[in-house]
């Protein structure tokens, strides 16, 4: 999966999906508008997430946990046990702890990017969207939205978005790619508008690490 795809909006819910009538029946247009409006209210965020990857051809499964920090516009930092990915909107640093290697590249986005910014700005222009149902949880209903890229050349086949109805925040996102690899991000904790410092989005290269500059 590409560096850009790892920015997800990122973002352990196992409930039966219900398609019966709910207290409020939402349309796709209403849900996407509410998501966009909620995103406009966020200047920065710190998200603790769990990531589950199921590789399509081998059925091997992996679990990770990490922290996503984001700040508008186009500033992201994703940290996990395996790697750190940082961008200031101009440059991307991808550091592998196991290899002690830093790959540096120019930050690029396209219409099918899964970065939070592009994802929200391009709804619904670049995706076919459908409502798949609801999940009942103690904290309230979760709305399940399925998105399919309109571009047949997209690396992503589909995205399932789990939205908390009473806050309009993303609680889980499931990405299926053309290799049938399914990547799930589940939000464990989220803090909004904490005034994250700009220096958070510049990577300090560890001494002695190998540098691969692709710019």
Residue ranges and their predicted role:
Residues 129-208, 212-215:
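Gly/Pro-enriched, hydrophobic low-complexity segments
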Residues 65-114, 183:
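An acidic-aromatic
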Residues 8-16:
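Bacterial N-terminal signal peptides
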Residues 51, 80, 174-177:
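Beta-turn initiation residues at beta-strand->coil junctions
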Residues 107-141:
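Flexible, surface-exposed loop/linker segments and immediately adjacent secondary-structure boundaries
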Residues 1-7:
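Bacterial N-terminal signal peptides that target proteins for export
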Residues 2, 17-61, 71, 75, ...:
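N-terminal leader/targeting segments and the immediate start of mature chains
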